[in-house]
């Protein structure tokens, strides 16, 4: 646990008592704060009270006397479509609102660091797609090359549940737009921006607000190094804002398709090869073809971002290459779960938006596509240029009929459920084809989250093997 600094003898309120909220309360208490807490769920409140938390109904004005700050758990709306009533009350009373990410950054450095030979560092990763894989890959590279490292944030362990940093340790964090938007302190040593595509727009008031939330990771004087995916205009804009010209090597531009030779520092992938350029000269190259944990162009973009971040903390190219080959990938992200009768079955349940689905569809030559769920704003008409490899679509969930109207001449069948989709695809798929779950939609109409959706798909496929 990382005790929160600067809260001794203050009364701090915590809103939301899931795993993150309870960890935040414990870290605040370890830092000497008096912690009061609230959650909208009766069962959650009862559980928290049994664990010794002091509950206080923060919906009542009279209970705010003496509260110095409100710490909100991830996922609780703090601005759009409208703030949670407790957060709105804090705003009205002038009580500062923060989250566990802000507390982490103000508490990460300790007096013990004066005895360290090498100062601990933080690499923080944000973006729309690929950030979990990029974060996990950076952590894997560090671990495989013998660097002390921890991973947390939106992946793995909550930030305040991490251990205090050791000498020379590198902490790798995945940060969502919800987390970066609210945090009052964001000071990573290396910040990574993978890409931007429309997502969570209702929570940010539109695409501009969503991008602004991501950009906050690069504010406050900026990180020592910024790794920026420049395949979208927002990334090119951000790189231009952070750098003092094309030759500034504090910004490492990355791409999966563009040749980036005229910059101070760049990493890009073309035709299956990763290249690193410094001041116009190629200094390293890696053959990405055949690396099983990084299939497809979208994973080559992730590899470029992870490579750049690892280089920014001093890892040598050949060490990174060796780590690439031992990376197993993450569940629900281009995960091959079986090959049955010459047909590959791939779980990309994390492809919850159009951009992620487009990248998944580009990775295979002949696809039987399972798509649908809770559709997002704008539908999937933008996928039209990506549907050439699709032999047939099997449409499930709330958006099935809407998706059927948006996929042009692509053959389709509305099957409603995952069980039906897997059964129909199994009956019709031919050797050499890939059955791909890349829903281009959220899971909440039929599943609690994308993980449960992917686990259900995987279980159904495994049953075919039995």
From Swiss-Prot:
Primary subcellular site in the record, as a coarse category: cytoplasm
Signal peptide feature range: none
Keywords from the named record: ATP-binding, Cell cycle, Cell division, Cell shape, Cell wall biogenesis/degradation, Cytoplasm, Ligase, Nucleotide-binding, Peptidoglycan synthesis
Enzyme Commission number(s): 6.3.2.9
InterPro entries given in the database record: Mur-like_cat_sf, Mur_ligase_C, Mur_ligase_C_dom_sf, Mur_ligase_cen, MurD, NAD(P)-bd_dom_sf
Biological process (GO), any one: cell wall organization
UniProt entry tagged with the keyword Iron: no
SUPFAM superfamilies: MurD-like peptide ligases, catalytic domain, MurD-like peptide ligases, peptide-binding domain, NAD(P)-binding Rossmann-fold domains
Domain of life, source organism: Bacteria
CC terms in the record's Gene Ontology section: cytoplasm
MF term (GO), any: ATP binding
Claim: Transcription is one of the keywords in the record: no
Reaction(s) catalysed (UniProt annotation): UDP-N-acetyl-alpha-D-muramoyl-L-alanine + D-glutamate + ATP = UDP-N-acetyl-alpha-D-muramoyl-L-alanyl-D-glutamate + ADP + phosphate + H(+)
Binding-site residues, ATP: 127-133
Localization, UniProt: Cytoplasm
Function: Cell wall formation. Catalyzes the addition of glutamate to the nucleotide precursor UDP-N-acetylmuramoyl-L-alanine (UMA).
Protein family according to the UniProt entry: Belongs to the MurCDEF family.
Annotated NCBIfam families: murD
Full protein name: UDP-N-acetylmuramoylalanine--D-glutamate ligase
Source organism phylogeny: Bacteria, Pseudomonadati, Pseudomonadota, Alphaproteobacteria, Rhodobacterales
Gene name, Swiss-Prot/TrEMBL: murD
């Amino acid at each position: 646990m990382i005790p929160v600094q600067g809260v001794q003898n203050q009364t701090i309120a915590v809103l939301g008592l899931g795993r993150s909220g309870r960890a935040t309360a414990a870290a605040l208490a370890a830092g000497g704060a008096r912690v009061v807490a609230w959650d909208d769920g009766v069962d959650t409140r009862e559980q928290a009270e049994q664990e010794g938390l002091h509950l206080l109904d923060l919906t009542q004005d009279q209970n705010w006397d003496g509260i110095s700050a409100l710490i909100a758990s991830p996922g609780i709306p703090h601005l759009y479509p409208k703030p949670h009533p407790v957060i709105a009350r804090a705003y009205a009373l002038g009580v500062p609102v923060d989250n566990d990410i802000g507390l982490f950054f103000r508490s990460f450095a300790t007096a013990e660091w004066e005895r360290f030979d090498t100062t601990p560092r933080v690499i923080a990763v944000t973006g729309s797609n690929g950030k979990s894989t990029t974060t996990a890959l950076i952590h894997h590279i560090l671990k495989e090359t013998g660097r002390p490292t921890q991973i947390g944030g939106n992946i793995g362990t909550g930030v305040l549940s991490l251990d205090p940093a050791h000498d020379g340790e590198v902490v790798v964090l995945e940060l969502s737009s919800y987390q970066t938007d609210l945090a009052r302190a964001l000071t990573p040593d290396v910040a990574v921006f993978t890409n931007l595509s429309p997502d969570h727009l209702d929570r940010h008031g539109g695409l501009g607000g969503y991008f602004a939330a991501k950009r906050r990771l690069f504010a406050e004087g900026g990180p020592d190094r910024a790794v920026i995916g420049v395949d979208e205009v927002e990334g090119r804009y951000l790189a231009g804002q952070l750098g003092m010209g094309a030759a500034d090597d504090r910004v490492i531009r990355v791409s999966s398709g563009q040749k980036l030779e005229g910059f101070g520092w760049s990493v890009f992938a073309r035709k299956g090869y990763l290249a690193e350029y410094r001041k116009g000269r190629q200094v390293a190259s890696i053959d990405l073809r055949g690396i099983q944990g990084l299939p497809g162009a979208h994973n080559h973009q992730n590899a470029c971002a992870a490579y750049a971040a690892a280089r920014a903390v001093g890892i040598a190219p050949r060490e990174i290459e060796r780590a690439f080959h031992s990376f197993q990938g993450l569940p629900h992200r281009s995960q091959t779960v079986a090959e049955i009768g010459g047909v590959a079955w791939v779980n990309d349940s994390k492809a919850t938006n159009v951009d992620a689905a487009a990248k998944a569809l580009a990775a295979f030559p002949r696809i039987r596509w399972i798509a649908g769920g809770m559709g997002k704003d704008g539908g999937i008409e933008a996928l039209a240029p990506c549907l050439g490899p699709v032999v047939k679509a099997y449409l499930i969930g709330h958006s099935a009929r809407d998706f059927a109207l948006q996929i042009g001449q692509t053959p389709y069948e509305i099957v409603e459920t995952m069980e039906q989709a897997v059964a129909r695809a199994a009956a019709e798929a031919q050797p050499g084809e890939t059955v791909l779950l890349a829903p281009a939609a959220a899971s909440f109409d039929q599943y609690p989250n994308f993980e449960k959706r992917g686990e259900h798909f995987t279980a159904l496929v495994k049953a075919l093997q039995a």
